[in-house]
Amino acid sequence: MLTITAIPAFNDNYFWIVRQADSNFAYVVDPGVAQPVIDYILAHDLILAGVLITHKHADHVGGIQGLQDFYQNSLPVYGPKAEGIAGITHEIIDERTLCLPHLEANVEIIPVPGHTLGHHAYLIEDAIFCGDTLFSVGCGRIFEGSAAQMLASLTKLASLPAHCKIYCAHEYTQSNINFALTVTPNNPNLLQYASWVAKARADNIPSLPSFLSTELAVNPFLRCHTYEVKTAVASQFNTEINDELQTFTLLRKWKDNF
């Protein structure tokens, strides 16, 4: 069974420490800075076995060099070759599975272009490490890809088993809820989730992970096929909506300017 722990960093990032419950070998996902990771590993008597990277942005890769310096360049660092990330030792090109030696679990590699063109998500048992593609009640900005690519990537993640947990890289949930309530103010699932998140954050508890089943019920970016979201988008932009891609494209534009 996996044990997954969040290391908070910067204003709203989470670096995820992943290990088997009975093992002291651990991996870290998207370390944007080295020292909090080193501090956690030492404080919990763990051995850092490697680094897993979803995409190239600095708040996800900025800690690679510091970790290699501390561990004398002995760390394997896995990440997408297409992202051109300095410090990657094991480039992922066309592979769809990855074996992390000390994790005793197969890692499914899921290409999710949109936020960046080479962005990957990783499915480990029932945990989805999706970087900046899917957030709780939201999705990432489209910096390099197209709306069609991002929608396809989100659809791919949405098709995974509903019991999977979403380990995204940022604590954006409350701000995403504020937007979602503007889009679908009468969604009872969203209202209930908003109440839970507000209490958790007031107690300084992470809102993550979220369950995919929850996201399918509350996340407007995963519900662009629904009448409720289509109608809201059509009203906001005073236009006729013809398909799901148009809904998603305009919804993302709405959020960008929210």
UniProtKB/Swiss-Prot annotation:
Zn(2+) 1 binds at residues 55, 57, 115, 132. It is an enzyme of class 3 (hydrolase). CDD domains: hydroxyacylglutathione_hydrolase_MBL-fold. Its cofactor is Zn(2+). Its EC number is 3.1.2.6. Pathway: Secondary metabolite metabolism; methylglyoxal degradation; (R)-lactate from methylglyoxal: step 2/2. Keywords: Hydrolase, Metal-binding, Zinc. The keyword Disulfide bond does not apply. Binds 2 Zn(2+) ions per subunit. GO terms for molecular function: hydroxyacylglutathione hydrolase activity; metal ion binding. GO terms for biological process: methylglyoxal catabolic process to D-lactate via S-lactoyl-glutathione. Belongs to the metallo-beta-lactamase superfamily. Glyoxalase II family. Thiolesterase that catalyzes the hydrolysis of S-D-lactoyl-glutathione to form glutathione and D-lactic acid. Monomer. PANTHER family: HYDROXYACYLGLUTATHIONE HYDROLASE, HYDROXYACYLGLUTATHIONE HYDROLASE GLOB. This is Hydroxyacylglutathione hydrolase. It comes from Shewanella denitrificans (strain OS217 / ATCC BAA-1090 / DSM 15013).
